[in-house]
């Protein structure tokens, strides 16, 4: 009886592992965070479906370890009508990414990262109490809060525009991210950032 021949594969010729593409389409490894202060807080861990089952919610500030796309999805759920509807929010972001790629021919994750960098305020105001009088004081914004504020402004823009427009939420989100990535002051999120910084500048 002839023995089956088994050829050992050379160590250097190992089969390459397939990358985890977001929504089986977008390569996260192509994206670079250009703002040095945000590198630590914009998480780009490759995932197919951005869903962590709440494992980052048990410890304070642990959300910095959550993929940035999932943080946007979670923020879109924080309305009275969309609470808990993660499948709906994932669908909105997935469709928005398709539209961004169709309009710009770019990786939509890269557009999202640029939009966050352009919409996160670098300074804001706090209220200090002196002898019973509240006095506004300008302070630098922490990098994690910059990311939080940016995602919040983008999500807020989608909520407000969806009430006034017949366009689907995915199209509104796509337009907002494209405009924010270019730093367009006419878009809601960039306008909110500039308003925060203008108030902080007057309180220096």
From Swiss-Prot:
Gene3D superfamilies: Ribosomal protein S7 domain (1.10.455.10). One of its GO terms (cellular component) is small ribosomal subunit. Keywords: Ribonucleoprotein, Ribosomal protein, RNA-binding, rRNA-binding. InterPro entries: Ribosomal_uS7, Ribosomal_uS7_arc, Ribosomal_uS7_CS, Ribosomal_uS7_dom, Ribosomal_uS7_dom_sf, Ribosomal_uS7_euk/arc. PANTHER family: RIBOSOMAL PROTEIN S7. One of the primary rRNA binding proteins, it binds directly to 16S rRNA where it nucleates assembly of the head domain of the 30S subunit. Is located at the subunit interface close to the decoding center. Part of the 30S ribosomal subunit. Belongs to the universal ribosomal protein uS7 family. This is Small ribosomal subunit protein uS7.
């Amino acid at each position: 009886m002839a023995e089956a021949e088994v050829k050992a594969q050379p160590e250097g010729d190992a089969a390459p592992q397939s990358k985890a593409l977001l929504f089986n389409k977008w390569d996260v490894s192509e994206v670079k965070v250009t703002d040095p202060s945000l590198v630590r807080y914009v998480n780009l861990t490759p995932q197919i479906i951005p869903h962590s089952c709440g494992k980052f919610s048990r410890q304070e500030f642990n959300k910095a370890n959550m993929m940035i796309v999932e943080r946007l999805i979670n923020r879109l759920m924080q309305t009275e009508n969309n609470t808990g509807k993660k499948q709906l929010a994932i669908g909105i972001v997935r469709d928005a990414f398709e539209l961004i790629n169709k309009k710009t021919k770019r990786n939509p994750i890269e557009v999202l990262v640029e939009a966050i960098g352009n919409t996160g305020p670098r300074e804001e105001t706090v209220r200090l109490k002196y002898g019973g009088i509240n006095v506004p004081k300008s302070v630098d914004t922490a990098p994690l809060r910059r990311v939080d504020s940016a995602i919040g402004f983008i999500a807020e823009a989608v909520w407000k525009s969806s009430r006034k427009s017949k366009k689907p939420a995915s199209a509104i989100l796509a337009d907002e991210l494209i405009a924010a990535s270019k730093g367009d002051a006419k878009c809601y999120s960039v306008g909110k950032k500039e308003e925060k910084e203008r108030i902080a500048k007057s309180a220096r």
